[in-house]
Amino acid sequence: MAKNLNSVSFIVLLLVLLVASTEILKSDAACFTFLGECGPEPFTGSNADCLACCVALYKSPPVCAGRVEGVPAHCHCYKS
């Protein structure tokens, strides 16, 4: 029984190391680091308007999303 448990533990450890070393779980779509706010308060536009404001303020490479959030509505800019 202990021999089987050790084998399973070893295989699980190898799989974890494989996934970590090849960055299989790393997503290019991850966009959750807060960059800053943009536009007036309260922000009356849509998410598309918010993204356009963020790109105009912070430029395109760092900005990956703009979302209208909060009460009152704010335009929040995010980078990956």
From Swiss-Prot:
**Where does the UniProt entry say this protein principally localizes?**
secreted
GO cellular component terms, alphabetically, are: extracellular region
Q: Which cysteines are joined by disulfide bonds?
A: C38-C64, C50-C75, C54-C77
Q: Name one GO biological process term.
A: defense response to fungus
Q: Please provide the record's keywords in A-Z order.
A: Antimicrobial, Disulfide bond, Fungicide, Plant defense, Secreted, Signal
**Where would you find the membrane-spanning parts of this chain?**
none
Subcellular location(s): the record lists: Secreted
Any signal peptide, and if so, which residues? Answer: 1-29
Protein family membership: Belongs to the DEFL family.
**What name is this protein filed under?**
Defensin-like protein 207
